[in-house]
Amino acid sequence: MICSEQGTPWYALHTPDAGAFQALIFPDSQSNDYTDWKHLAQDAAARNEGADFFINMGDLVDNGEDHRQWDAWFDAVAGIIDRIPVAPLMGNHETYNEDWKVREPVAYLHEFTLPANGSEEFAGRYYSFDYGPAHFIVLDTQTDEAADFHQGLLEAQQAWFREDVRKTDKKWKIVLMHKDPLQYRIANRPERQEGFSDEGRAWMPLFDEAGIDVVFSAHLHTYRNRGHIKNFERDASGPLYILTGVAGNVRYPGLWVDHALDKTVAPQPETDNYLTLFKDAG
């Protein structure tokens, strides 16, 4: 890139393979010290040199308007983000200002140039992209946080989602959403019931309708594999639901009570993790 006769270094670029790809999926990387996040990201990249792109599942930083945290986040992925693309999600922490009040996610929207979604009002909040035989749909689950600034985010996004899915001809349809569709009981808080979150009740019927294959979520800083769910119950014909874990050093040991739909739970206490998503050439 050249600007005012000054240029960046040269970077390699490759196009997707028609059949195979590999992606790294990082859960919430928010931290009070981004050292752990840097170690995890760099180790993941070193162990997976063939990765084509990486995903960060929202709450990239602890405070969305603290530019020191953004500097630390980008420093952690130096050498990675300049050779493979990133698909970021907005989390609720991207909507906080330095007084911990909810505001527009100004920094997040300026840090990343994301595919257009046809909306001027909600530009950058949700989007989709293709990679090889897969269609990825990135949702904005911050409807509560946006309510003071925008009306109709959920309705606009759901209309866009239906049209976006209708137009794709890709074999695999994968949803990425920050807030988790399941609701967990919290230890020592009996008033909170197990079930489905507002996001789950709003989106899971649409995932069933659209024939989504996999749903990745985050927000709870824990890893859970729920298997396939349809019509709010276990069903092999529904999407596979994966709660991705934690990639930063903000951890909630012993907070969540296991859900009846959990099939696999990470060993406790949990440490940092990432996921690898493979599609072979077959």
Predicted regions and their residues:
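Acidic, histidine-bearing metal-coordination/catalytic regions of metal-dependent phosphoesterases
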Residues: M1-I25, Q30, Q42, R47, ...
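Extended active-site neighborhood of metal-dependent phosphoesterases/phosphodiesterases
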Residues: I2-P9, R68-D169, R189-S197, A202, ...
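Alpha/beta-hydrolase fold active-site loops
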Residues: F21-Q22, D52, Y126, P133-A134, ...
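Conserved, compact domain cores that house catalytic/ligand-binding motifs in diverse enzymes
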Residues: F21-T95
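Active-site neighborhood of phospho(di)ester-bond hydrolases with catalytic His/Asp-centered motifs
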Residues: I25-P27, F53-D59, P85-N92, D140, ...
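Short, glycine/acidic-enriched loop or turn micro-motifs at the edges of active sites
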Residues: S31, D62, T143, P181, ...
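Glycine-rich phosphate-binding loop signature in dinucleotide/nucleotide-binding domains
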Residues: A44-G50, D164-K171
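Short acidic, glycine-rich surface-loop motifs adjacent to enzyme active sites
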Residues: V61, T168-R189
